[in-house]
Amino acid sequence: MASTLSVSKIQGLATAANPTTVEVSSGHVLQAPGHILQVKQAQFLGNYNFNDASYQDITDLTLSITPSSTSNKILAKCILCASANANQRFGVRIVRDGSMIFTPTSIGSRTAAHVFGDGAGSNKPTMPSVIELLDAPSSTSSLTYKVQAHCEASSTLYINSTETWSDDYTKFGAVSTLTLMEIAG
């Protein structure tokens, strides 16, 4: 038999050790859809570059998270500071357990990415690549999210730096991040 409890205010007993706490019996859960249940963040504080025609994991931008319910979602957000050789394109994506979360449709033989950029060369970094995806993994198992990037063949991709990386005040070092939030479903 289902019941409905309608109240305008819930208050703990004044004689309780903590009268502002509502206790829930063991094994039961209060549902609050849309609330953030856990947050994790990884930062890549250094810089490096690579040249490879296939997707590569970005150093330190890997996180694992275990959802508490199959109805919960994972908000994955990446801010990646990247640059490439002049007029060379690069792509960035987030993968869950090795697979791209969302894949663009009708791409033909093009390479799938969540965001892409075109290198400005020398000391001209591109704007940060920002990805924000709401994933619905339907899982309570540990999930591993990674940021990956790749550049056109024979070109170099620079993470948190630029092609010209001399040690002077006119150059900037950046930080790239991956943030995961479990959202109650």
What residue ranges belong to the model's regions?
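Glycine-centered flexibility motif
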Residues: 2, 12, 27, 34, ...
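Glycine-rich, low-complexity segments
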Residues: 2-47
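Solvent-exposed, conformationally flexible loop/turn segments
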Residues: 48-58
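Local beta-strand/beta-hairpin segments that build beta-sheet-rich folds
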Residues: 37, 57-60, 101-103
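Short, surface-exposed loop/turn motifs at beta-strand boundaries within globular domains
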Residues: 3, 35, 56-58, 67-71, ...
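Short intrinsically disordered coil segments
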Residues: 24-26, 57, 164-165
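Terminal beta-strand-rich extracellular "head" domains
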Residues: 43, 49, 64-142, 146-185
